[in-house]
Each structure stands twice: as structure tokens, then as C-alpha cells.
Amino acid sequence: MPDYRSKTSTHGRNMAGARALWRATGMKDEDFKKPIIAIANSFTQFVPGHVHLKDLGQLVAREIEKAGGVAKEFNTIAVDDGIAMGHDGMLYSLPSREIIADSVEYMVNAHCADAIVCISNCDKITPGMLMAALRLNIPVVFVSGGPMEAGKTKLASHGLDLVDAMVVAADDSCSDEKVAEYERSACPTCGSCSGMFTANSMNCLTEALGLSLPGNGSTLATHADREQLFLRAGRLAVELCQRYYGEGDDSVLPRNIANFKAFENAMTLDIAMGGSTNTILHLLAAAQEAEVPFDLRDIDRLSRKVPQLCKVAPNIQKYHMEDVHRAGGIFSILGELARGGLLHTDVATVHSPSMADAIARWDITQTRDEAVHTFFKAGPAGIPTQTAFSQNTRWPSLDDDRAEGCIRSVEHAYSKEGGLAVLYGNIALDGCVVKTAGVDESIHVFEGRAKIFESQDAAVKGILGDEVKAGDIVIIRYEGPKGGPGMQEMLYPTSYLKSKGLGKQCALLTDGRFSGGTSGLSIGHASPEAAAGGAIGLVQDGDKVLIDIPNRSINLLVSDEELAARRAEQDRKGWKPAAPRARRVSTALKAYALLATSADKGAVRNKALLDG
């Protein structure tokens, strides 16, 4: 059986100095026989999804100690993509994922911790911690801060979120008073933004990967029920330590739980619920850390057979995460997928022997456990707050309507094919991705004229300046991992196209990426990126581009001979933006760009450059 990793610094005469330091943190003689469990928290006052996490690490710590472990908390950084959006701050968002992963590795390995509880929530924090957990491969439990309640206003018949505020702000026909009302109402509580944006998508996927508890992705940040997830996570971490270090059961290690089948399950869920395209980027990165051979071709294969069973904002205004929870949360979607023969149910989770066992217990349409039904009735209170667990509101009933409800059965799916698709063609030889859940069926096949912008800033200026017309395909390039650097999100360009009434009359293609709040014919992650010699860098104004989602293709309608001539000319000039950009790129960002791969590889570091 494996020894505690922590024995490296807690046992032996030569570790007297280390033990002296451990004692200075509060450890006693009896503690040196216990597992040391790291709590990776991500509290910050900069991010609404993390503002309520300050005391939750210690909540978990006390539970770890009651269960027989030693808890040691540390913090990571967290970037708010919404606040960093639309300016050079967004250059730092994706690179922060690598910093978070590294910081968790540094702290856990430097202090020889035996296990981790990861307290995450927003866009890059969950992926960064997931990458670290799979890299370290020691027992881990994820517990997130939970989603925000949807906003409410008398000016709208539906729940509000961040994107609503952005769209009305860019709409010249909206009064200042309406904009102010939306601004004050869109984000009423702590928690990750209320739709199926990147943060909530990733927290849901940790359930499908088997690394978090049921309800992790959908239980509101404000609801009292969420406290139980934190308490259970602390106890479970100690239990996993006992199974691995005490009994030699390596099935509890994250790489044995998050195996190839589990990654397929996670992507299947993502496609079925119309999650953010960013999840593709993050799952590919996590798979590389886990040494799982899961790539874009697997995602393409799954996207052709998995139906869309759930539609949530920004893909539909009617539903937000609180509605997903009322409909039974993630395990109800997984249950429908399992009954459709689309899920691997023999994989283990941190909390159940198999996914089949977990579905039997947690799917509201299958279980008779009244406690489970009560759990999924947890709803919003509609009271602005930054305090976790501050309300105990219940829906009067569950949404178990699988024909017309928030979550559908396979037979009543919103669409036969799921909410994400991978497109290939001469403009993106290694692929690009589109969130089909947010694309109107009338433009699933779209041919248009290329309108070139060498940066997101230029595109925003062009769209707001009415340079973009109906029938245009906006091309935003040199915004990939290397070219940006940092692969900015393009939420402002897509939101402004909507506000200009062009949401169904234009398309957008970029080697950058999109916010989970994006909808419309928005195609990102074009690989190879322009800065790496990708064909997106060869497109010229007025070129015709054909997008064909049903046939999973995207092509520049230019002859091979012409493309070859353009490539030779670009090789001579160098793969850089044609127009200069007023962008200050720091040393930290240059270091990221030096090692970054294109999006089809998850925008992770190119290890070949490190290994020589």
C-alpha cells in the first residue's frame, strides 16, 4: 500500500525542522499520523462567482478534521472574464488557466499533500484545477461555488443575465433608463453567471467526469442546500485517502475515474446540454494532463450522434441554471442519455461505485427518495446578496416533463444532433467549433462575403460603425493562443451583431474563442491559428466562404492555386497582422505565447519544445 506523500516532511529525525514548521501552523503530535489534505480555494473579491468563498475553505477544513484528516488551505488567482471582456484584460484570461494549474501543482507538491479539495467556480478556475488534479493524480474532490440566480425586472418577461445587459447597452433604440435597469437587475447575487455559460458548463462536466458530487453544477450559490456539498466534500476527501493509502485502492485516483469513457461521458453531456464551446478547449487540455487519447475527432464523432436534450440561456431565454436544477440537474440529463444508450454507465465516480448506481439514486424520474426530490426543489429567493447559503426557498414542484420541460428525453429532444459541432475545411484544416444550440436553423448553411478584421478591437469598431452588412462573414484573426496572445473571447462582437439586428444575417469566424454567453452563427477555435500559419490568415476581403453545419464543413471558395500563391506571399511577409495593433503584450504573455499550441490541442503548452 502507498505511504502518505506527506510522510516526506512529517516523519524521520531529519525532518525535525519541517515538523517544527508544521507545528507552527497548529499541528500536534497526533496529526503527523493523519493525511494532509490541501484545500485549493479561489476566493477573490474581484469575481461574483468567488466573492462568497472566503469562509468556505474553513468550512471544508473543519469537516476534514472531524473525519480524521489534517486540512491546509491555500488560494489561487481567479479572473472574471466578464469584467476583463472588451479590453486587453481579456488577454490574461486563458493564460490564467495555466497559472492556476501550476500554482496548485506547486503548492501540493512542495508541501507533499496527500489529497485535494478543489473549491472552484468560474471560467478558467475549474479547468485549471482540473488540469492540476489530473497532473498530480492524487485523491481529489471538486466542489464549486454554484450558479448565480437569474435576474428579474418588470421590463422583461424572462430571467436576465449578463448578456442581456450587454445587448441592450449596445442597442441605440434602448433608453438610458432601460439600460440602467438591466444593468442593476442582470446579476443579482453571488455565483457564476446564471446561464449555461463556461463556468456552469465546466462545473456540470465535473459531475459527468465523476469528480464532484451530484448537484455541484446546478445548486444555486445562495441556497442553503449547497452547504451540504461542501461538508460532504470534506468527509469524502478523507474517505478517498483511506481507500487509497489505507487499503491500496487506486480506483479512487482521478486518472482512473476520469478515463477515456468518462471524457466521452463529459463531452456527451456537454453536447446534450448545449454547453459553452470553451468546454471543448478545456476538456482537450484536461485529457492531455490525464494522458487520455481524447481529441477533436472524438468530439466530432460524438456531436453527430448525441441529441440536444436541454436548452438554457444564452441559447433560450426561458431557462437558466435554477431551472436545470428544478428539472433534476445533471444526473437527470445523464439518466436520459443512459436510457438512450449514449452513456458509459460502468465508470466509477468519487461518490458511487458506478455511474449507473449514481443515476439510479439521483435521477428524479427514477428514484423514489423524497430527500432527493426535495434537494432538486431548491430554488431562487430573488433577493440580491453576496452571501452563500443565505436562503432556503423551494419550488412547489419539480419539472419532470420530459416532453416539453427544460430537460427532454431522447424521444423529445430539441434537436436530433446536439448543441456543439466541429467543422473542417480548407480554412480550418485542424478544425473549428460552433455552438449549434445557439444557431437558428435557417442559417445552418450560410454563404457570405468575408469582412476581415485583424483584431477584436477593430471588429467592434467596425460593427458599431456599420461597416458590417447583412450577408457578411466577419473574420477576426490573429486572436489565437499565440497571435493574441491569449485567445480572447469574442462576446462583444457577437453581442453587437445582435444589437444591430444582424444576429441571423451574418456569421463570425475567428481563431479566438467565445464566451459561454455567445449565440448566433459564431465559429471559433479555427486551427491552425493565423499566427501559426493557418489558412484563416490567407482570407481577403470579399472572398466567399461557405459554412455547412449539417455536413460539418467550412471552406474558403478560392482555388488551391490561389491559396498556394497567397501562402507563399504570406510566408515572405511573416504571419503577423496586416495592420498594426495598439496592444501592449507583457513579458508574461509573451512567455505564454512562446509555448502555446492552437485550439485543437486545447491551447496547452507544446511539451515538445520543453522536452527538447
Curated annotation (Swiss-Prot):
Its EC number is 4.2.1.9. Keywords: 2Fe-2S, Amino-acid biosynthesis, Branched-chain amino acid biosynthesis, Iron, Iron-sulfur, Lyase, Magnesium, Metal-binding. It holds the Pfam family ILV_EDD_C. Mg(2+) binds at D81, D123, K124, E489. Binds 1 [2Fe-2S] cluster per subunit. This cluster acts as a Lewis acid cofactor. GO terms for molecular function: 2 iron, 2 sulfur cluster binding; dihydroxy-acid dehydratase activity; magnesium ion binding. InterPro entries: Dihydro-acid_dehy_C, DihydroxyA_deHydtase, DiOHA_6PGluconate_deHydtase_CS, ILV_EDD_C, ILV_EDD_N, IlvD/EDD_N. Pathway: Amino-acid biosynthesis; L-isoleucine biosynthesis; L-isoleucine from 2-oxobutanoate: step 3/4; Amino-acid biosynthesis; L-valine biosynthesis; L-valine from pyruvate: step 3/4. GO terms for cellular component: cytosol. Disulfide bonds: none annotated. The active site is at S515. One of its GO terms (biological process) is L-valine biosynthetic process. The modification N6-carboxylysine is found at K124. Transmembrane segments: none annotated. It catalyses: (2R)-2,3-dihydroxy-3-methylbutanoate = 3-methyl-2-oxobutanoate + H2O; (2R,3R)-2,3-dihydroxy-3-methylpentanoate = (S)-3-methyl-2-oxopentanoate + H2O. It comes from the Bacteria. The keyword Iron-sulfur applies. Its cofactor is [2Fe-2S] cluster; Mg(2+). [2Fe-2S] cluster binds at C122, C193. Belongs to the IlvD/Edd family. PANTHER family: D-XYLONATE DEHYDRATASE (PTHR43661), D-XYLONATE DEHYDRATASE YAGF-RELATED (PTHR43661:SF3). Homodimer. This is Dihydroxy-acid dehydratase. It comes from Pseudomonas paraeruginosa (strain DSM 24068 / PA7). The lineage of its organism: Bacteria, Pseudomonadati, Pseudomonadota, Gammaproteobacteria, Pseudomonadales.
